[in-house]
């Protein structure tokens, strides 16, 4: 081996390093020159075969060459990485003058909106919002509410029963029973939540939301009931219309009534729409919860939240509320 060979090898190596166009090629050169079997490494391994008088000089020369090539590799790597970063910054450049992307605006479900609207109106009238269990026993769901044993609501085809006799509540009236058992009159409360019945069509769902209200006091009358519900309907729909109380039967009230409103349709015609049920609390219900019906009277009412949502938002099919179609729900955001 002669010095000229080393100088020639060095010049070629530095030229190849300087000409490398990407990091992969540069790594290939590093292995070819300085790797375990690289050309410079092999030269260093051959030093032992040289005469003693040449070994030191050539060894020093090879070490300088190795350091020189190593520095050149690092410099070229830094240059390639810098160039790659600059290109990426140019390619990924953001035009700050472009309009920003608006985030998706979320909104409450129309049933939730309606539920909150109803409870807020009754809160202004002094009613306390109370919750209760969705799995009930026969006593709280039927017996305490004066349902006779033969009443069709107790039938398997109308109610979802568990094997132990418990059931999914068919109304929120059971919450009223629990509340009256723990509180003494005078009292005002509403019970809101999910209820379950074996029914499904365009205007009925196996699960829906119901709000029931109760007032107990001395000398409460049907006139008070009519005034309360008429005020609620005006506040909810934000308009005045004729309200009709039509006699009807419910086991837990006497007398009972259905409430109809004179609803103006899209073609400007008017028809009566049933919107809720109500009545004076039956003396047997008060007796079952230990309240003296000779001293206290009261009224109760119940309404379907989805029914009111359909009327407020002009929805024809109740099932649309539960299909989670974003195109439908986005209208109410």
Curated annotation (Swiss-Prot):
Pfam families: Phe_tRNA-synt_N (PF02912), tRNA-synt_2d (PF01409)
Superkingdom, natural source: Bacteria
Gene Ontology cellular component list: cytoplasm
Annotated positions binding Mg(2+): 254
Cross-referenced CDD domains: PheRS_alpha_core (cd00496)
Assigned EC number: 6.1.1.20
InterPro entries: aa-tRNA-synth_II (IPR006195), aa-tRNA-synth_II/BPL/LPL (IPR045864), Phe-tRNA-synth_IIc_asu (IPR004529), Phe-tRNA_ligase_II_N (IPR004188), Phe_tRNA_ligase_alpha1_bac (IPR022911), Phenylalanyl-tRNA_Synthase (IPR002319), tRNA-bd_arm (IPR010978)
NCBIfam families reported in the protein's UniProt record: pheS
Quaternary structure and partners: Tetramer of two alpha and two beta subunits.
Name by which UniProt lists this protein: Phenylalanine--tRNA ligase alpha subunit
Organism this protein belongs to: Xylella fastidiosa (strain Temecula1 / ATCC 700964)
């Amino acid at each position: 081996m002669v010095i000229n060979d080393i100088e020639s090898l060095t010049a070629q190596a530095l030229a190849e390093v300087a000409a490398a166009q990407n990091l992969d090629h540069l790594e290939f050169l590093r292995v070819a020159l300085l790797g375990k079997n690289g050309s410079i490494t092999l030269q260093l391994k051959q030093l032992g075969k040289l005469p003693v008088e040449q070994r030191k000089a050539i060894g020093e020369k090879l070490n300088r060459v190795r350091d020189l090539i190593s520095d050149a590799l690092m410099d070229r790597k830094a240059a390639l990485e810098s160039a790659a970063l600059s290109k990426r910054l140019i390619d990924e450049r953001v035009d700050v003058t472009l309009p920003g992307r608006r985030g998706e605006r979320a909104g409450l479900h129309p049933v939730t909106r309606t539920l909150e609207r109803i409870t807020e109106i009754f809160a202004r009238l002094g009613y306390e919002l109370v919750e209760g269990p969705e799995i009930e026993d026969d006593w709280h769901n039927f017996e305490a509410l004066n349902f006779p044993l033969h009443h069709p609501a107790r039938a398997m085809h109308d109610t979802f029963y568990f094997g132990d006799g418990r059931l999914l509540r068919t109304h929120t009236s059971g919450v009223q029973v629990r509340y009256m058992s723990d509180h003494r009159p005078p009292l005002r409360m509403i019970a809101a939540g999910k209820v379950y019945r074996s029914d499904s069509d365009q205007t009925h769902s196996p699960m829906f939301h119901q709000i029931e209200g109760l007032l107990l006091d001395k000398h409460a009358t049907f006139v008070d009931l009519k005034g309360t519900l008429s005020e609620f309907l005006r506040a909810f729909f934000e308009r005045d219309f004729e309200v009709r109380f039509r006699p009807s039967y419910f086991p837990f009230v006497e007398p009972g009534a259905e409430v109809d409103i004179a609803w103006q349709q899209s073609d400007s015609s008017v028809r009566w729409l049933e919107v809720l049920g109500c009545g004076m609390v039956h003396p047997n219900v008060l007796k079952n919860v230990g309240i003296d019906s000779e001293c206290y009277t009261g009224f109760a009412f119940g309404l379907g939240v989805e029914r009111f949502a359909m009327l407020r938002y002009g929805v024809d099919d109740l099932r649309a509320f539960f299909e989670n179609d974003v195109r439908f729900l986005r209208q109410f955001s």
